[in-house]
Amino acid sequence: MKADIHPNYEVVAVTCSCGNKFETRSTLGSVLAIDVCNLCHPFYTGKQKVLDTGGRVQKFADRFGMFGTKK
């Protein structure tokens, strides 16, 4: 490997928009601002909404299902 071509891998202070702060390692710099983290993301907090696509799929099949059948 060539010497002195890789970026520095430093400790970075990460701040979320919800106010959560933690440290990790990165080559991006010393401060990193993010929009969502594990404390405010809906998937991790249990507030994720499941969309009901069954009605839409059935509506599509009712309208266009006849085109897939052979006579």
Swiss-Prot record:
Biological process per Gene Ontology, one example term: translation
Entry GO terms, CC: ribonucleoprotein complex; ribosome
Necessary cofactors: Zn(2+)
Residues binding Zn(2+): C16, C18, C37, C40
Keyword Magnesium: no
Subunit structure: Part of the 50S ribosomal subunit.
Function, in words: Binds the 23S rRNA.
Protein known as: Large ribosomal subunit protein bL31
Species per Swiss-Prot/TrEMBL record: Pseudomonas entomophila (strain L48)
Record lineage: Bacteria, Pseudomonadati, Pseudomonadota, Gammaproteobacteria, Pseudomonadales
Gene giving rise to this polypeptide: rpmE
